[in-house]
Structures are given as C-alpha cells and as structure tokens.
Amino acid sequence: MKILIPTAKEMNTDLPSIEAIPLKPESQTVLDALALYSASQLESFYKVSAEKAAEEFQNIQALKRQTAQHYPALKLFDGLMYRNIKRDKLTEAEQDYLENHVFITSALYGVVPALSPMAPHRLDFLMKLKVVGKTLKSHWKAVYDEALKKEEVIFSLLSSEFETVFSKEIRAKMVTFKFMEDRGGQLKIHSTISKKARGAFLTALIENQVQTVGEARRLNFAGFVYREDLSQPQGLVFVKEV
C-alpha cells in the first residue's frame, strides 16, 4: 500500500541539511530544461516577482552545479497540508510506516519516499515546461506508472493535476478522499479545509498504521468522521460538524 501526497510551493530551509543523492536521468533531463531559463524568463514562467524569480534562478543553478543544500522532502515542504502532518517526535513504528508507505509526487524528482533528500525548487505539472519536446506529464507518465504498478491499494491525497500524470490503469486502483464541513446541515468544501484535513488524515494514517480501506473508514481525526452515505467504494468522504 502506498500513500501519495503532492509537493507544496511553500518551503522551510531552516533545517539541518542532509546528503544529496544523484538525480535520476529523468530528473536530470527536467533540470537541464529548467536551467535554460534566465532569471527574467523565470519571472513570466513562474508568474512571480523579479525578486522571487532571481531566488528560483539561484536554486536551479545550484542544483545544476550540484552545490544545492538538500533536506528531507517531508520537512522541506511547508504548505498548509504539510504543517498539519506529524513530522517530529515519531515513534519507531510511525517512522517505519512513513518510510515504507508515504511517497511524494514531484515534477522534478518523480515518485519518491517522503523523507528523500530534495533541494528547494519550484515546479508542478501545471507549468508549461517542455522536456525534450514533451510536456512534463508525458515525460513522467511511464516512470510514475512503474513506481506503482505492483501496488494493489493506492491512497491518493493528490490534486487532479498530479493524479492525471498516471495512466487510467493506475488511477483505477486509487482510493481518493474528500473532506467537508457541515455548517448547519450545509456541506461545504474549500481548499483551506481540504489542505488542513489532508495533513490531519495522513497523521491519523501514520499513528494508526492503516493498511486497508476498511481501517481508513474507521478513523476519527480532527473532528472528521467517515460518511458512508456520501462515499463511493473508492471515494471516501469525511465530514466535520462545525
């Protein structure tokens, strides 16, 4: 069983660095394409300020020169979902579960264990980077599928732009999750609720060593409970009353 989570734009580098590992050939090809952009070109590519683009340019060039600092990916990314994941003071069993079951899907690194070394960078599958004439999605599709072809159960906490990198055959094995709030009988869903809940849900998976869909249904976390009446066999819905 594998649990898939996306990358995040926000990063925290106020961490002890760890040793890098060599980039896979598929990652190196992506980096080579990204490294062709000047700082001013990155400004429009990323749709960010000149200051932010200059910072990203330095990050890319450091990776290219193999001088970039690397950090455990799960701790480097620091978006709302990540800030709601238990990342410190893990028991030995929780650490083992994290290492064996939780994987990050990256447009630069591929599908990698959550604690893999990563350098600060910005790239997702909505960005129109051409890699040897291919889109990012088509460049990665075979590698993404290969990473999961032996899995019977895949828990996806990904957004659609990450899920659609995988073939239909792999997506057919995915169990997806929706998190909603019940406000006086009205069910609401928005990105802040979803991101926080994904992090809390992953924490519950880790703490309870969940291996099956049945075990996931029984979880009660951060006020969320499973709603069978709203769920499908491979699309579980959790609701929090507020």
From Swiss-Prot:
InterPro entries found in the cross-reference section: YaaA
A single GO BP: response to hydroperoxide
Pfam families the record matches: H2O2_YaaD (PF03883)
One cellular-component annotation, GO: cytosol
PANTHER family, per the entry: PEROXIDE STRESS RESISTANCE PROTEIN YAAA, PEROXIDE STRESS RESPONSE PROTEIN YAAA
HAMAP family, sorted: UPF0246 (MF_00652)
Family from the record: Belongs to the UPF0246 family.
Name used for this protein in its record: UPF0246 protein SP70585_1589
Originating organism: Streptococcus pneumoniae (strain 70585)
